[in-house]
């Protein structure tokens, strides 16, 4: 198989893997309400935290990260170039955001994007996690934490391993675009903060 065909196959595989909505499946297995119709209506870890608590949210977070990490890592090991790696990672995120198996109603893609970046290195992963946690602790906005982390991710990547700056920048742009409604609410002071009891929409 040529590298071009391999890349196309990986893009399709990444999208299909991303289309498996772990939030919906975990909620079904746990007997919880459908996250698409409860809380923020967003099938992501933050909304599952509100609906079902920390353990359910942790499962969703792990599975969503794997949807990005596995295709990106496999493609890297197969010798796919950096820009194509970015496209494959974006395909996984687009599967999460617009899942073909769940009527194209998905989440924000934050955990999947992080999963795709994680194989670059533990130092980058720790920097991204630390940034997200610090912003959440300061302001309690999951969406703002995701946006700030996405903005800083290319700079972190350039510092730790500049080979992957372009694909990470591609992922960051997708995350920021996906959060445009959150940005509008933040500017208006209408965004919900992280809470298990209040409406949240940042993940």
UniProtKB/Swiss-Prot annotation:
Pathway: Lipid metabolism; phospholipid metabolism. It catalyses: an acyl phosphate + sn-glycerol 3-phosphate = a 1-acyl-sn-glycero-3-phosphate + phosphate. Its EC number is 2.3.1.275. GO terms for molecular function: acyl-phosphate glycerol-3-phosphate acyltransferase activity. The chain crosses the membrane at residues 6-26, 56-76, 82-102, 118-138, 141-161. It is found in: Cell inner membrane. Pfam families: G3P_acyltransf. Keywords: Cell inner membrane, Cell membrane, Lipid biosynthesis, Lipid metabolism, Membrane, Phospholipid biosynthesis, Phospholipid metabolism, Transferase, Transmembrane, Transmembrane helix. It is an enzyme of class 2 (transferase). GO terms for biological process: phospholipid biosynthetic process. One of its GO terms (cellular component) is plasma membrane. It is a multi-pass membrane protein. Belongs to the PlsY family. Catalyzes the transfer of an acyl group from acyl-phosphate (acyl-PO(4)) to glycerol-3-phosphate (G3P) to form lysophosphatidic acid (LPA). This enzyme utilizes acyl-phosphate as fatty acyl donor, but not acyl-CoA or acyl-ACP. PANTHER family: GLYCEROL-3-PHOSPHATE ACYLTRANSFERASE-RELATED, INNER MEMBRANE PROTEIN YGIH. This is Glycerol-3-phosphate acyltransferase. It comes from Shewanella loihica (strain ATCC BAA-1088 / PV-4). The lineage of its organism: Bacteria, Pseudomonadati, Pseudomonadota, Gammaproteobacteria, Alteromonadales.
